[in-house]
Amino acid sequence: MLSIGFGFAFDGIATAIEKNQYPLSERYADDIRASAAQYGIPEVILWATVCTESGFASNLEGKNGGIGLMQLTPQEFTMIQTDILKEAPEDAGRLYDPEKNLQCGAAYLSYLYERYGVWETVFAAFDAGTATVDAWLLDPEFVNELGMLKNIPNPETARFVKDVMKARELYIKLYFQ
């Protein structure tokens, strides 16, 4: 009986630690929900991507030039606005606006999902770019018999995909079951 009690206590501690590492940030919850709904992607995908990309730091400037919650580069921001959203491009400073950053990131993830149809491939393209992923998909060394990526030759992109997929699984377990 005592061991069962310790088991429940350990599970509770483990869950609390996981929720600390993979939070539902109330600060961005409404914008994440709205952007996911607007662009037809599962809310959990945005939570996992933001957690992995920026850890919810809206002013983060990444080493690759990415800015904000979704770590979009100014070039990606312009491409998303003009090619996907069919909008006039705004100043890259808008990437620091969490709502705009999330909207553009969600639009891009939606576009990538329509293009690839598999979340692992979507996350690879989100990290490495579509031209790179398209080249990998044409190389039999990197795809399985179904034409899906089986291994990612870029270690940084492979780690990113693994991390986002892990975050997705934990967000589902903790909040979206």
Label every PLM stretch briefly.
Residues 1-11:
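Hydrophobic membrane-insertion alpha-helices, especially the h-region
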Residues 51-76, 108, 129:
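Cell-wall polysaccharide-cleaving catalytic domain and substrate-binding groove, primarily
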Residues 124-177:
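Catalytic and substrate-binding regions of cell-wall glycan-acting enzymes that process beta-1,4-linked
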